């Protein structure tokens, strides 16, 4: 039986929370500087790749890709955690619509794991290889628009866990 990639999953759940809040949907990314595409059927990019990161995200798959309003989205991912991630870890999320900042918020990574019942996972997150799978609902009311999302996770000591980014589009109906 495989373990879940807890840190990655928390970041993906922030993506899910943003979807549920109606601020993001389809990724249509032009890669920002210092990024690399994440393998799989996902338009996510790992950002801040010149900095040491405690998680290597190997693959992310979204089904359907791109996500569809009013339908379930299955998120599958795998990767590796290199160092223990403990209570106090956090995620900074920023969502922009063009030059307008819609959201700039910090979330507790461990609380995010618990609140979303991610296969019963909780901190501390031990080093190792992990696979995850989660199904989330995308509301039909998501407004059209083009958004840029950046999520950076840090340890309680402010070491970079990982960074995810993507440009997101919900077309008009």
Swiss-Prot record:
Subcellular localization, as worded in the UniProt entry: Vacuole
Gene Ontology cellular component annotations, sorted alphabetically: fungal-type vacuole; fungal-type vacuole lumen
Gene3D superfamilies the UniProt entry points to: Ganglioside GM2 activator
InterPro entries registered for this protein in UniProt: GM2-AP_sf, Ig_E-set, ML_dom, ML_PG-PI_TP, NPC2-like
Disulfide bridge partners, by residue number: none
SUPFAM superfamilies: E set domains
Quaternary context: Monomer.
Family membership: Belongs to the NPC2 family.
Biological function: Catalyzes the intermembrane transfer of phosphatidylglycerol and phosphatidylinositol.
Protein name listed in UniProt: Phosphatidylglycerol/phosphatidylinositol transfer protein
Source organism per UniProt: Saccharomyces cerevisiae (strain ATCC 204508 / S288c) (Baker's yeast)
Upper lineage: Eukaryota, Fungi, Dikarya, Ascomycota, Saccharomycotina
């Amino acid at each position: 039986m495989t373990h879940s990639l807890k840190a990655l999953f928390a970041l993906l759940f922030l993506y899910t929370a943003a979807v549920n809040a109606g601020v993001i949907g389809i990724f249509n990314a032009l890669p920002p500087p210092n990024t690399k595409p994440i393998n799989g059927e996902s338009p996510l990019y790992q950002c801040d790749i010149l900095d040491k990161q405690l998680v290597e995200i190997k693959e992310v798959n979204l089904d359907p890709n791109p996500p569809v309003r009013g339908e379930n989205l299955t998120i599958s991912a795998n990767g590796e955690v290199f160092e223990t991630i403990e209570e106090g870890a956090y995620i900074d999320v920023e969502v922009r619509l063009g030059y307008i900042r819609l959201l700039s918020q910090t979330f507790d990574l461990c609380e995010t794991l618990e609140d979303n019942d991610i296969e019963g996972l909780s901190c501390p997150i031990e080093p190792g290889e992990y696979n995850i799978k989660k199904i989330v609902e995308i509301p039909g009311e998501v407004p059209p628009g083009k958004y840029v999302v950046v999520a950076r996770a840090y340890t309680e000591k402010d070491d970079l866990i990982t960074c995810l980014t993507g440009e997101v589009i919900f077309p008009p109906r």
